[in-house]
Amino acid sequence: MSVEKVLSLIQENEVKFVDLRFTDTKGKEQHISIPAHQIDADFFEEGKMFDGSSVAGWKGINESDMVMMPDASSAVLDPFTEDATLNIRCDILEPATMQGYDRDPRSIAKRAEDFMRSTGVADTVLIGPEPEFFLFDDVKFATDMSGSFFKIDDVEAAWNTGSDYEEGNKGHRPGVKGGYFPVAPVDSSQDIRSAMCLVMEEMGLVVEAHHHEATAGQNEIATRFNTLTTKADEIQIYKYVVHNVAHAFGKTATFMPKPLVGDNGSGMHVHQSLAKDGVNLFAGDKYGGLSEMALYYIGGIIKHARAINAFANPSTNSYKRLVPGFEAPVMLAYSARNRSASIRIPVVPSPKARRIEVRFGDPAANPYLCFASMLMAGLDGIKNKIHPGEAMDKDLYDLPAEESAEIPTVAYSLKDALAELDADREFLTAGGVFSDDFIDSYIELKSQDVERVNMTTHPVEFELYYSV
């Protein structure tokens, strides 16, 4: 969408406010609203100054001025606001140079795509993520010096089979790990997901399907692939819609990977492929219908997977999902169709749809950083011809201990992932896509999460140790 079309859109829809949005390092959208009468063509050249020191992991107070530069092509009407509002996504620029800030996730994603094109390997990367999420009726949590707790409740939860409800307990709910694909009334979220899909399409996403997932309250909405930065933008819209539609239905939504103990967590599988001049570069005559380039791309992902974990699985909670027994792919292997492998080659109707699916990521990830790090790892694999070895077509969840010990795994904790990122960063800094400054600041920021969790007394510790 051009600047002229944006200005026309404002007039035609009697827009009252323009909401400028950007994504911080942790992956959370931030925003500032401006009266629409302040917006003209010059605004898209000059941007909006703001205080970058207020964003975690960004500027110090002594050099805090930054520029939000609106991207006219991202403009979309907000369906949730009472007054007509136009949302526009922004890049964050350094005011001295008017270049992308090296800690701005969206600028990093754009640099990754630019770097890919500069190598001559491909001109397009297509990304198709599958974020899962939970819908609950009630969530309470607190942490202070006197204690800590969390308490989740939902009508679908197995623990409510004996609960009393004012309107009566209807009894239809999924069992533990038993929620995949049942129709209503076991699936109680059909209408909510349908409403989410309609709003997503209103905001420009192309919805392909929606369904209940394996766990009580767990859902998935599948949307069509897109180019890397645009798809990351769409994931932010996806999350915004899920949160706000859930709220309107009296529910609460979360993209936290593992809120429930003893049941499956939420993943974000990321389908991806490279193309050049409209030709899918991943289609070929090698294993699974892949090209040699695609195999090298897989090799790069596997080699750098534990560093990628720092972006694809960026929470301490992520690693409560990445454990055996809950359908989470922890082994760094690839296979056609085999969902126990961390990289799968899906069955496709034609070679032009050939792609790989990286399965270890989760929806807590900042999409810009997650997708960019995977692309950079894949490009490194292509550059250095890193072959992934033999495919693993057997059930990796059921291997003998001695055999599984020979297969590399994802990182076991956020602390481990950050250490791997620190040691294995050259593939990210190629072409100046990720800077050492950003990686250092990211490690420092996420290490604060690790330290806080490690320093907080846990209720299970009372269970284990109070009577020693």
From Swiss-Prot:
GO terms for molecular function: ATP binding; glutamine synthetase activity; metal ion binding. It is an enzyme of class 6 (ligase). Its EC number is 6.3.1.2. GO terms for biological process: glutamine biosynthetic process; nitrogen utilization. Residues 105-468 form the GS catalytic domain. It is found in: Cytoplasm. Residues 13-97 form the GS beta-grasp domain. Mg(2+) 1 binds at E130, H269, E357. This is Glutamine synthetase. The lineage of its organism: Bacteria, Pseudomonadati, Pseudomonadota, Gammaproteobacteria, Vibrionales.
